[in-house]
Amino acid sequence: MDRTEAQTRADIIDQQLALSGWNVKDPTQVIEEFDILTALTEGVAEPRTPYQGHQFSDYVLLGKNGKPLAVIEAKKTLRDAALGREQAKQYCYNIQKQLGSELPFCFYTNGLETFFWDLENAPPRKVVGFPTRDDLERFAYIRRNRKPLTQEFISTSIAGRDYQIRAIRSVLEGIEQKKRDFLLVMATGTGKTRTCIAMVDALMRAGHAEKVLFLVDRIALREQALAAFKEYMPNEPRWPNVGEKLIATDRRV
């Protein structure tokens, strides 16, 4: 179905925002057609039209303090969502400049595909839906308070072999370079689990990770991993404990 941009917003994007707890009719949460003041073209002293020197963001999501958390640029369903990428980026930087606030997070979507961009920290990535207000505020808190990973201490009491330290350091440096995907190939007996735990420990201490999913393909490996996390990161709550089947959202591992 060929929807216009207005139909795409009303029929799809508004509903997706509602699923994440955003009320597009509440101006304390969402502002549509957010007015962004921009400089006039060089040599133009006065605006020739009421809209010259203005940009209008399709949506701006607000934090509980009323400041912009995120910008959403919408395109109609039959257009490539990526066509809104640079436009959304420009809006984010102009809002930051206009308000003197933190740089908003960036979204661009056609209703069928949505991309999230933490502009100065990671490349855009495809997501399913929009984060809640609490999620975005948590992302902003992490971004504001995390420490550089290049100098982060690696606990050699967890993984102290030279090749383990090199592997962890390589991943930490890659994250600082805005990379998102890493593959470590390690033979049996080389300390894969302890290498992962030391990496998780460094990421959590630096404020780059709040929760970690450690995925295994056999129950026996799950028990081994749980025991290892209990030994080397005893203060971090883990799931599952004995007999637990329902996922507990208050655990960090």
Segments the model singles out, each with a brief description of its role:
Residues M1-K211, V216-E236, T249-V253:
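ATP-dependent helicase/translocase motor core
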Residues N241-T249:
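Short acidic low-complexity segments
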